Amino acid sequence: MQTEHVILLNAQGVPTGTLEKYAAHTADTLLHLAFSSWLFNAKGQLLVTRRALSKKAWPGVWTNSVCGHPQLGESNEDAVIRRCRFELGVEITAPEPVYPDFRYRATDPNGIVENEVCPVFAARTTSALQINDDEVMDYQWCDLADVLHGIDATPWAFSPWMVMQATNREARKRLSAFTQLK
C-alpha cells in the first residue's frame, strides 16, 4: 500500500493541506479528517476489533470495526470501503452516515494525540473476514446491545472514540437499525 496522508483542517473543518499519516500522529497532532465505521454481519452482529500492538496510537485496544483517513480527492464512503478491504478483507454495502458531525480529541497512554473531524458510518457485509494482522490482532462478532452495555459499564476497556460515538443517543439509534435483518 502506498504511503497514506491525512488531510489537515482548520478550526472550521476546511482543508488546509496534507501530512504523512505516521508523522501526523504525535503529542501535538494537528486537526485532520478521519472516519470511523461500524460493520454488521447478516445476523445483525457488530464486528468489534482489537487494534494490533504495532499501531502507533492505542495499540491493543478494543474498538469499533474500522477507522482510517480519506485520501486527497477520495470521499469518506470510498475511504471506508478501501479500509474495510485492507484491514478486514471484506466487501461491504454502501456506508451510511450515523454520526456525520463527530469530532474529538483524545490522548493515549503513550502521549499520542488523536485530533479528528471523524464522520461515523455503518455498513453491512456478508463476506468472510480475511484479517490483516498488521492492523487487527483480534476480533469478535457481538450483539450491539451487549457491546453498548459493556461500554456503559467499562468505558476504559474501549477506544475513546468508540465510547464517545456509542454514547451519542442519535448514533445509538442509527446503529441499532443495522441490527435488523434484511
From Swiss-Prot:
A GO MF term: metal ion binding
Report the EC number(s), separated by commas if there are several: 5.3.3.2
What organism is the protein native to?
Escherichia coli O7:K1 (strain IAI39 / ExPEC)
Q: Which keywords describe this protein according to UniProt?
A: Cytoplasm, Isomerase, Isoprene biosynthesis, Magnesium, Manganese, Metal-binding
Which cofactors must be present for this protein to function?
Mg(2+); Mn(2+)
Q: Which PROSITE patterns match?
A: NUDIX (PS51462)
**How is the quaternary structure described?**
Homodimer.
Give the reactions, separated by semicolons, that this protein catalyses. Answer: isopentenyl diphosphate = dimethylallyl diphosphate
Family in the record: Belongs to the IPP isomerase type 1 family.
Give a yes or no for keyword Manganese in this entry.
Answer: yes
What detail does the entry give on cofactor binding? Binds 1 Mg(2+) ion per subunit. The magnesium ion binds only when substrate is bound.
What NCBIfam families would the database entry show?
A: IPP_isom_1, PRK03759.1
Is Transmembrane helix there in the keyword field? no
Binding residues annotated for Mn(2+), in chain numbering: 25, 32, 69, 114, 116
Which HAMAP family does its entry note? Idi
Q: Which SUPFAM superfamilies match?
A: Nudix
Name recorded for this polypeptide: Isopentenyl-diphosphate Delta-isomerase
Compartments, record wording: Cytoplasm
Q: Which residues form the Nudix hydrolase domain?
A: 30-164
What single Pfam family name could you report for this chain, choosing any that match?
Answer: NUDIX
Instruction: Name its GO BP terms in alphabetical order.
Output: dimethylallyl diphosphate biosynthetic process; isoprenoid biosynthetic process
Query: Main role?
Result: Catalyzes the 1,3-allylic rearrangement of the homoallylic substrate isopentenyl (IPP) to its highly electrophilic allylic isomer, dimethylallyl diphosphate (DMAPP).
Q: Where does Mg(2+) bind?
A: 87
